UniProtKB/Swiss-Prot annotation:
Pfam family, one: 2OG-FeII_Oxy
The protein's name in its UniProt record: 1-aminocyclopropane-1-carboxylate oxidase 2
EC number of this enzyme: 1.14.17.4
Enzyme class: oxidoreductase
GO function terms (MF aspect): 1-aminocyclopropane-1-carboxylate oxidase activity; L-ascorbic acid binding; metal ion binding
Gene name of the encoded protein: ACO2
Binding site for Fe cation: 181, 183, 238
Catalytic activity: 1-aminocyclopropane-1-carboxylate + L-ascorbate + O2 = ethene + L-dehydroascorbate + hydrogen cyanide + CO2 + 2 H2O
Keywords: Ethylene biosynthesis, Fruit ripening, Iron, Metal-binding, Oxidoreductase, Vitamin C
Domain Fe2OG dioxygenase, residue spans: 157-257
GO biological process, alphabetically ordered: ethylene biosynthetic process; fruit ripening
Cofactor(s) it depends on: Fe cation
Length: 325
């Protein structure tokens, strides 16, 4: 399928007469693609340029040589490489909420720390704006999705960023940049390299490239939104294909529920399905951290068994007697 059919949403169109068409595109993207790309999303080009510059410089100064040493050892024993248990990527993680760890990440200079904090603030605002647009599309009360995400004991979502580089790979037929998976969380916002491609999603049994567009933010639906919408929105398999040329930058930020937030299908959506006599199976109810504990072990496996495991846990918990003393 041509990349031109990939859903690209100009957020400026949400302000005027073309809003209905833009909202229809958003709905189609969430229901049938699990991915879309945003233009004119409110994050300045100047800030995105700084984010790209500080992260590429950080990789060059502190991580490139380490990765070359890892790659050399890996390729020297290529006959022993298990491609199902290896990703060709260099990564580090930043946590923003409920508490930040940016000051503790080694080798980050003050400019990089300040830039990434500023970027995180802008992404948080964009994620919350998107959640309200999704509420509008779903017919849910404004703020519903954010309240679910912030429904844990600290009243905050979990929000963090994975900073990745995918260096040139001499054996892309053997090793994936990142193996196929769905994302466990809520809504994912990706600032990707606009010069080196590699991100692909699975649609209709075909791997489709997510087009690298300058100054865009790629958004994808995580497993938790699939549960909350009772399957109306879908998280989809995606992967990164290793490239022989170029170093691909990927900065993915995950706006997820709080660790002890309880996730369950929105009652209003379940009731609407019942009224319309849609006989859909209802997704399970669980604590987000319980799902994450399973996901950590099963990330690169199908999502459906994870949902079934949560459903089994829900049945066991509901069958236990309630303490009276």
């Amino acid at each position: 399928m041509e990349s031109g059919s990939f859903p690209v949403i100009n957020m400026e169109l949400l302000q005027g007469s073309q809003r209905p068409a833009a909202m229809a595109l958003l709905r189609d993207a969430c229901e049938n693609w699990g991915f879309f790309e945003l233009l004119n999303h409110g994050i300045s080009h100047e800030l995105m340029n700084r984010v790209e510059a500080v992260n590429k410089e950080h990789y060059r100064r502190f991580r490139e040589q380490r990765f070359k040493e890892f790659a050399s050892k890996t390729l020297d024993s290529v006959e022993n490489v298990d491609p199902d248990n290896l990703d060709w990527e260099s990564t580090f993680f930043l946590r923003h909420l409920p508490t930040s760890n940016i000051s503790q990440i080694p080798d980050l200079d003050d400019d990089c720390r300040a830039t990434m904090k500023e970027f995180a603030r802008e992404l948080e605002k964009l994620a919350e704006r998107l959640l309200d647009l999704l509420c509008e599309d779903l017919g849910l009360e404004k703020g519903y999705l954010k309240r679910v995400f912030c429904g844990g004991s600290d009243g905050l979502p979990t929000f963090g960023t994975k900073v990745s580089n995918y260096p040139p790979c001499p054996k892309p037929d053997l090793i994936k940049g990142l193996r196929a998976h769905t994302d466990a969380g809520g809504i994912i916002l990706l600032f990707q390299d606009d010069k080196v491609s590699g991100l692909q999603l699975l649609k209709d049994r075909e791997w489709i490239e997510v087009p690298p567009l300058r100054y865009s933010i790629v958004v994808n639906i995580g497993d938790q939104l699939e549960v909350i919408t009772n399957g109306k929105y879908k998280s989809v398999l995606h992967r990164v294909v290793a490239q022989t040329d170029g170093n691909r930058m990927s900065i993915a930020s995950f706006y997820n529920p709080g660790s002890d937030a309880v996730i369950f299908p929105a009652p209003a959506l379940v009731e609407k399905e019942a009224e319309e006599e849609e006989k859909k199976e209802i997704y399970p109810k669980f604590v987000f951290q319980d799902y994450m504990n399973l996901y950590i072990r099963k990330k690169f496996e199908a999502k459906e068994p994870r949902f079934e495991a949560m459903k089994s846990m829900e049945i066991v918990m509901s069958s236990q007697p309630i303490p009276t003393a």
